Structures are given as structure tokens and as C-alpha cells.
Amino acid sequence: VYVDSSVLIASIGNESYGEWARGVLAGKEAVSSAIAKVELARFVHWVGQLSDYLRPVISAVSFAKVDDQAIAAATAVSGEVKALDALHVGTWAHLKTVGVECPFITLDRKQAVAASRAGATVLHPFGDLS
């Protein structure tokens, strides 16, 4: 599965979607964009000492480079979502072009819509996205 930072962050703590995030990730191989490492580090700095919780999350995820192809794919959705969210969708789209077929998991409604429009099967807790 391709997992957005919002899901990784929720899986660490007791946020409202924490249980959902842990359940949807359980037993799955996960990949995310390398930018997720920065987003996770920012979260840790924001909430304090969570490094003991962060290490297992980071070690369970493969991180894909943000290369020119991912950036090019991100520009296609950059008008719909924030820049980092577009980079996640772009990274997923690039992975698809190199043969990695996987659903996109997010806790961001706008990003879910953008990923769906980009062709992803999107797992999210929101019900209908329309």
C-alpha cells in the first residue's frame, strides 16, 4: 500500500483515526514518499518525545525518492491539494508507472479525491468522496 504521512502520524498516536490507521496498515507492506520522513520528524518536534514510537513506523515503511518523474506527476494535481500532498500523489503515480500497483491510503479528503482522479484505488475513512 502507498501510505500518506497523515496515516503514519495517526498510527503512532491516539488521534481520532489512530485505530483506523493501525487497522488498515496491519500486515501490509507499506511505501511512502521520502518527504514523509520530514513530515514525521516535524510531528515529533511538535508533540515532544515520540521517537520510541516513531522508529518502528519508519522501519516498517519503504521510502521512495522524490525524483523528477514524481514531481512531474505531482504538478498534475498541484491545483487541487497542498504541495506536499501533491508530492505524495505524484510519488504514487510514478511508482505505478514503474510497475508498483498499490492502493493509496490517506486521512486527507482533498488528497483522497486527487489520488482517485489520478487513477488510484483510495482507502480512506470518509465514505463517499463526492
Question: Predicted regions: what is each one?
Answer:
Residues 27-30, 60-62, 98-103:
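Short active-site oxyanion
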Residues 33, 94-130:
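Acidic, PIN/NYN-like endoribonuclease modules and their adjacent C-terminal/linker elements
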